């Protein structure tokens, strides 16, 4: 079983906790996200260099993901123009199911492999670009299919997941595993996995813009 889907022994009885204990437990568990990112710092640095090279060649940074992972990519991309004064086309976020899935969950979108390919083609991904696929569990068919198509187009391909030995790693030039472990609520990867992913994406965009 994937670690992100396992039950967390420290929160088995969180529903019985007093409010303050519940809050303290969630704060304590959130440190796992920071530790997971620290553990992947070498791969993150390699990815920053690859993304920076893509930007220097006149390429773009594209994030692609489903659900929370996709939303985090769109969020990071949307903050780049006001923060760094760059074109909205330089850093783009693509979410499975389209922009309406930013506001309304579509649980089947992550399994639509053909849509991943289509979205890469629709965004004219080429050899100048760097594409970051984000999948907490590491097996979203939409993301894996998109990364395969991006690699066919000659783009640099980076994968971000929160489990080891998962399908996404087989299609990446660089694979980043932020091993966040079991969530406070079983399988709710919007929590620690999402926090770790947001930190990583913040690092990608910020360090890249500083280097550019």
Predicted regions and their residues:
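Cofactor-/ligand-binding subdomain signature composed of acidic, glycine-rich
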Residues: 1-36
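Substrate-recognition element of Asp-dependent hydrolases with the DxDx(T/V) motif
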Residues: 61, 65
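A generic structural signal for well-ordered alpha-helical segments
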Residues: 54-55, 150
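Glycine-centered short loops/turns at secondary-structure junctions
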Residues: 58-59, 154
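Short, positively charged patches
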Residues: 6-9, 45-49, 60
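Short, basic, glycine/proline-bearing loop/turn elements
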Residues: 29-39, 105, 130-133
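A short, well-structured juxtamembrane/interface segment
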Residues: 39-54
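Glycine-rich phosphate-binding loops that contact phosphosugars or nucleotide phosphates
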Residues: 66-212
